[in-house]
Amino acid sequence: MTEISILNDVQKIIVLDYGSQYNQLIARRIREFGVLSELKSHKITAQELHEINPIGIVLSGGPNSVYADNAFGIDPEIFELGIPILGICYGMQLITHKLGGKVVPAGQAGNREYGQSTLHLRETSKLFSGTPQEQLVLMSHGDAVTEIPEGFHLVGDSNDCPYAAIENTEKNLYGIQFHPEVRHSVYGNDILKNFAISICGARGDWSMDNFIDMEITKIRETVGDRKVLLGLSGGVDSSVVGVLLQKAIGDQLTCIFVDHGLLRKDEGDQVMGMLGGKFGLNIIRVDASKRFLDLLADVEDPEKKRKIIGNEFVYVFDDEASKLKGVDFLAQGTLYTDIIESGTETAQTIKSHHNVGGLPEDMQFELIEPLNTLFKDEVRALGIALGMPEEIVWRQPFPGPGLAIRVMGAITEEKLETVRESDAILREEIAKAGLDRDVWQYFTVNTGVRSVGVMGDGRTYDYTIAIRAITSIDGMTADFAQLPWDVLKKISTRIVNEVDHVNRIVYDITSKPPATVEWE
């Protein structure tokens, strides 16, 4: 099969974005069934969808009311495409509203529902095949459907929601008031799988090998015979991008590894050894540590740090690219979650991301972001599919701004050194305990807080280091890792004894949400 025929033969389920911070989880769950799923704007037209030729469409949740003046709508012709459609929460209400039903504030029809609720199935449905008649689901709605459109019938309800699941099988239209994409809906994965496989007819044959073929084709068509510049950060994402780009365009790729003085312990030498030596990437190493640290002096605001670093990275690339001939593209390791956290057209910005929000307006390159439709676990799977060794693929995630966002407040060499050394100890002990595959991400943070301590016979007034360790599947949500006490005790003892200017260790037990993974 040729690469072009692979591209044309890929089955897709499109998720239309109506503003939920977690609507991308829908796409992520569907991909788990071996089906490519992508997020598109709710403004997409029926003609544009027809050209994409998806086998299914999902209308996501969102914060608006469908009857409000500023409500996000839908091209009504989409309902006439003959493509199966699943409306989730706002999506179900939108289907109802547009096709002649009625949606009102929940107080006029039952109560608002936020949290787990029991769904009672009243009829059999292909959408709920293999799931129990009563099941826990996550509700999050302030409006409710009171009248369903002609041709629809009730499938399920809850104590506070008269229409929790509806369908029109003749037109292949389905609506559910709850969120199957979150783990709190116990059978949510089964419901989404039923929609993808049983209703949409997905083959379930999407894989990272397909992705590699597609992305290589896209890269070659985009780049042609021109050259690409890639900034290596030392993290998994940029490393995978480097190997993928080299596979696609070979020596048209030049990598710049910028040592901004904000790297982990021995990171520079490790990057050069792994990617420059083993994989033969053409890497230019630039020591710009003084340049970055001078700009960051006395800067405390995390958003300013990110913007400064994002801008300066590109200016460094600009300086280096000016020494090269014919470089037109800048490649980045931006992930789906990076774009999500920076806010989409319909979702509130949580924080700007260094790969999407810190670029200067006068940037001289076109962007290539091969991973911007992938989640972190998919990037690791891609790395394995590309033949990268596990020690690279499972390397701890590291943000582009580096240790700058793991030092609270103003950055100093002393603070940076406390994070470098404590982080190295943490990673070493987690690996020794055999937990490095169980804990999704772990690192240390200099909190900027000093506290009184006693060492030997003397009083100390030194920094407090926080340990952050989380478990997650895709980075969209996360729980703090419940590390064994003996492991935590050993880590704490080593850091206090081996790292200068530190006398207290605390453990971050906050999940995401409400917190983000990084502290800044």
UniProtKB/Swiss-Prot annotation:
Alphabetized UniProt keyword annotations: ATP-binding, Glutamine amidotransferase, GMP biosynthesis, Ligase, Nucleotide-binding, Purine biosynthesis
Catalytic residues identified in the record: 89 (nucleophile), 179, 181
Domain GMPS ATP-PPase: 206-395
Gene Ontology MF annotations: ATP binding; GMP synthase activity
Organism superkingdom: Bacteria
Matches recorded under InterPro entries: Class_I_gatase-like, GATASE, GMP_synth_C, GMP_synth_GATase, GMP_synthase, GMPS_ATP_PPase_dom, NAD/GMP_synthase, Rossmann-like_a/b/a_fold
Amino acids binding ATP: 233-239
Catalytic activities: XMP + L-glutamine + ATP + H2O = GMP + L-glutamate + AMP + diphosphate + 2 H(+)
One Gene Ontology CC term in the entry: cytosol
Leader peptide range in chain numbering: none
One Pfam family recorded for the sequence: GMP_synt_C
Metabolic or biological pathway, per its Swiss-Prot or TrEMBL entry: Purine metabolism; GMP biosynthesis; GMP from XMP (L-Gln route): step 1/1
UniProt entry tagged with the keyword Coiled coil: no
EC number: 6.3.5.2
Limits of the Glutamine amidotransferase type-1 domain: 12-205
Task performed by this protein: Catalyzes the synthesis of GMP from XMP.
Subunit structure: Homodimer.
Name of the protein: GMP synthase [glutamine-hydrolyzing]
Naturally occurring in which organism (per UniProt): Streptococcus pyogenes serotype M2 (strain MGAS10270)
